[in-house]
Amino acid sequence: SMKIALCTELRNVERFESRLRSLFDEDGQLAIDELWNENQLAQALRRSRYHAVVIAMTGARGLEAAIQAKQLAPETPLVWWSDDKNFALIAYHLRIPAFLSADCSDQELYEAIKPIMKWRCENANCAMQL
């Protein structure tokens, strides 16, 4: 099974989680921990290991969460979704390759997360094909 930490404001959770599930959860093996702020994210990252961290937050709170994820779980792949395209450059400087704007398509979301799934499969030598 695959475990993702999803840090997002409450009103986004349903929509974003359903997108993740429709793209990646063919076999019901995707576990998503919902975290609603950077403090909860920090607690979760100290407590558990994840295959990926997805941050979907508006404005500077997303930046704070991204910085925290990089500090606490530097090896864990990170996807940052933001309503502010100006953060793309900051993401680049933080070496976060997967930065998505709020209006990203399912294809863009898939492309951002697919390498994570692939990386996990190679390490766990699972049979999942992408």
Segments and roles (model prediction):
Residues 35-51:
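Acidic, metal-coordinating helix/loop segments flanking the phosphotransfer/catalytic sites
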Residues 1-4:
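Extreme N-terminal starter segment of soluble prokaryotic enzymes
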Residues 6-11, 36-38, 54-59, 82-83:
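Structural motif
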Residues 120-130:
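Short, Lys/Arg-enriched segments at the junction into DNA-binding effector domains
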Residues 33-37, 99-101:
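Short acidic-hydrophobic, aromatic-tinged amphipathic segments that line or gate anion-handling sites
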